[in-house]
């Protein structure tokens, strides 16, 4: 089987965990259960078939360096799980647009190199799948790269909360071009949103009325520092909120995107946490006899490795769709792997739909 030729835009902690993760599991036995992956062999593709052939960034400490070096450079501070040999993939100067917010601009030095022609670079590298890891709030930049993917006939995996796959206009653009997209906003393996979503549904399934809830997140990576700029947070808060409330069938919070009784979002930046994230979640409800029933928990994770396996699955799903000539949103992959897919499903149903897609039993 041929490799999946992958390009990355945004060589931050998530890209670091992705590149390290492919190296870490490249020799995994196909019958092994790997934490964070649906399958070692996802359809025709093994983890080792993911091959990085291009990368784009705007950080002067990354542009011009081999991807294997850039993933450990500048402000990247995630846990190291694997050495990565030289890849022969220099990080190219990407397009900035709105990709650098206030805190990014104060922290890193923007490369003075000329931005490359992204479409031509994707074509030259014969890229199959482009993964967008741009900072939260990069609305213009993310849509720019999405258009580049369409123009270069490259499948697009949208890991950030900019609504592209879930926007009917953009979905039609991808479908008309025959280019697959998996988006929007990557889920973690076991993160704050997925645990919150499951427990909110558990309340409902057990007949408890969920009246109010919050999810407060703190971390020490550049993602959290960037999100101190509250103007960049609107889509992030919406994505996390609707991921939780869309899993409720009825009750006062069902389907709510904005409500005083639901608060879900990043809260603060704590530098010494590095790439760790701490989530504080509380659910308040009413049980039999209108008696209060409250649940509170704290989740501690390394943020970036927590989604790396999910991205590997998303990349392989996008490539399968490309192989089959399917354009537009890949609904089964999106509903299981993303927080804000075009169509929300309960998680067990989403996984079953994706398994059926892998087997070729449903189109998308």
Enumerate the language-model features and the residues they cover.
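Rossmann-fold NAD(P)-binding glycine/threonine-rich loop
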Residues: 135-151, 159-180
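Rossmann-fold dehydrogenase core element
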Residues: 173-186, 207, 211
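Short gly/pro/ser/thr-enriched loop/turn and capping motifs at secondary-structure boundaries
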Residues: 16, 163-167, 187-192, 219-221
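Receiver (REC) domain switch-region micro-motif
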Residues: 130, 156, 293
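NAD(P)-dependent Rossmann-like dehydrogenase/reductase catalytic/cofactor-binding core
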Residues: 306-364
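Structural motif
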Residues: 9, 133, 159-160, 184
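Active-site-lining helix/loop region of Rossmann-like oxidoreductase modules
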Residues: 9, 48-51, 62, 69, ...
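N-terminal glycine-/serine-/threonine-rich beta1-alpha1-beta2 phosphate-ribose binding loop
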Residues: 1-145, 233-238, 279, 288
């Amino acid at each position: 089987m041929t490799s999946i030729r992958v390009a990355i835009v945004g060589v931050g902690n998530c890209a670091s965990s992705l590149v390290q993760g492919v190296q870490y599991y490249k020799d995994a036995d196909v019958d092994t259960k790997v934490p964070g992956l649906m399958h070692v062999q996802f359809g025709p593709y093994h983890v080792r078939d993911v091959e990085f052939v291009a990368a784009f960034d705007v950080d002067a400490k990354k542009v011009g360096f081999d991807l294997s070096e850039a993933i450990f450079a500048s402000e990247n501070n995630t846990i190291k799980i694997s050495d990565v040999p030289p890849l022969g993939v220099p990080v190219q100067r990407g397009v900035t647009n709105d990709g650098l917010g206030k805190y990014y601009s104060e922290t890193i030095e923007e490369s003075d190199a000329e931005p490359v022609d992204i479409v031509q670079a994707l074509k030259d590298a014969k890229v199959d799948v482009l993964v967008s890891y741009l900072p939260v709030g990069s609305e213009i930049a993310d849509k720019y790269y999405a258009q580049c993917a369409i123009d270069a006939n490259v499948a697009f995996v949208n890991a950030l909360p900019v609504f592209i796959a879930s926007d009917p206009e953009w979905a039609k653009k991808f479908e008309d071009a025959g280019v697959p997209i998996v988006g929007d906003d990557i889920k973690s393996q076991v993160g704050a949103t997925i645990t919150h979503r499951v427990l909110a549904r558990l309340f409902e399934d057990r007949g408890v009325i969920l009246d109010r809830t919050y999810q407060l997140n703190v971390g020490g990576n550049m993602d959290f520092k960037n999100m101190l700029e509250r103007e960049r947070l609107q889509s992030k808060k919406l994505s996390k909120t609707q991921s939780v409330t869309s899993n409720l069938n009825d009750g006062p919070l069902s389907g709510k995107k904005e409500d005083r009784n639901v608060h879900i979002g990043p809260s603060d930046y704590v530098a010494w946490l590095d790439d760790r994230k701490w989530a504080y979640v509380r659910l308040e409800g009413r049980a039999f006899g209108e008696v209060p029933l409250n649940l509170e928990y704290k989740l501690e994770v390394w943020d970036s490795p927590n989604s790396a396996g999910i991205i590997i699955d998303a990349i392989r799903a996008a490539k399968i769709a490309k192989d089959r000539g399917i354009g537009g949103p890949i609904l089964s992959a999106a509903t299981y792997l993303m927080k804000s897919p075009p169509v929300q499903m309960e998680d067990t149903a989403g996984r079953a739909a994706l398994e059926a897609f892998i087997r070729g039993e449903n189109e998308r």
